[in-house]
Amino acid sequence: MEGHIEWFRDQVIFLTGGTGNLGVCLLYKLTLHLPTKKIFVLCRGSVQRALDKLEAAMAEQFDDVLDSHRVQFMVGDTSKPSLGLKPSDLRQLQDEVTVVINAAADISLQQPLHLSIQTNCIAHLELLTLICGFSRLKSFLHVSSTSVNSFLPDGIIEERIYPLCEEDPDPEKVLSHILHAGQSAYTENFVAPYALCKYLAERLILKQDNLPFNILIVRPSLIGPAIRDPYPYYGNDEGMPLHSAIYNLATDPDYGLDELGKGINLDAVFDEIPVDLVANTCLAHLAAGSIGIVQAAGSLYAASTTGEITNTMIESVAPMAIEKLRRGEIRQSQNLAPMFYQVLERYMRTWDIRCGRSEHLKEHTGVLGLSLDGHDAKAFMKHRWQNVTNLVFGLSST
């Protein structure tokens, strides 16, 4: 893997979504683990806002990232023409950038289709158009999601595009209808509107012909806390759907701990992967010159069933907290439990998400490897849920 690490020495990277869950991990690795020449980070609102988010996410590593003197922040917005960049900033990107990593997304499961299509499809297509003017660009990495295939029946899911239905409608026509009508007949086939939007983005990005740079699409499954980088258990709850779901379901009197397992397939594998393994997958495939679709799912880590996760979580909650929950003393102010329950019902399926293009990385330790040497997945999960239940309920069993 040494050659792959050295590849970064000549790369100037433009990163969107750099203050998000995956983006922070990518930025950490690009600055402190890899000899990356330079990283431009798009930040919305102000540079100070981005710095505050980065410091909150990785307080102990924050100064080292800045002290690398290889990170330059640029104020902009993926929803605006030309990313809302100053003309001088855009010219600098056009002249210097060799790799674009698009990790920006709005993963809200509540966002209606007519809004999600703008942030999770249109913005990506406009970014692709913009970067066609980057004179030194070699590769475009677009971060997608395995949820793009949530319309499929149970079974094997390969690293490829699947048609929406037997007739396979033109994705441009599907997009046009959504923009005109604000809805789609295909929405209900997906776990959430977000997933349909990401599906269309994939189809339309890969439909582009004769581009002068490589296109790589990485599909993570649900992202979980880091096992190593930037530190164990790194990750904010907003970027980890399972934590949000547990919090809202467990604290809702109509669901609660006693009802968590009812109506959900407890034997289904809960497909989740640590955020740092997703980052390693992205960066290793970039350096290898991979193109097309790469999946980063639970098979690259340690599979757990929904029942195992639920039992471990319940065992981590102190009896006093359980009684408080049952008496309704611990409540969530927003009534999001029905939405999360519906999503879990749709998501808890017997899909077998294949990650064949990355299996070889499990044999490699180090910066870009996926080896689990020295990592105890069961102990990690137990400690993780002790941390989560302590934060959610204020108490833990230990």
Model features per residue range: what roles?
Residues 102-103, 110-115, 122, 126-196, ...:
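Conserved Rossmann-fold NAD(P)-dependent oxidoreductase catalytic core, especially the SDR/UDP-sugar
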Residues 156-177, 193-195, 199, 203-270, ...:
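NAD(P)-dependent short-chain dehydrogenase/reductase
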Residues 1-106, 113, 134-135, 139, ...:
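N-terminal Rossmann/SDR dinucleotide-binding element
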Residues 43, 144, 297:
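Short beta-strand/turn micro-motifs composed of small residues
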Residues 11-12, 105-115, 182-191, 202, ...:
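Glycine- and acidic
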Residues 281-371, 380-385, 389-396:
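Mid/C-terminal beta-alpha module of Rossmann-like enzyme folds, strongest
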Residues 65-70, 130-137, 201-214:
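A structural motif corresponding to the C-terminal end of an alpha-helix
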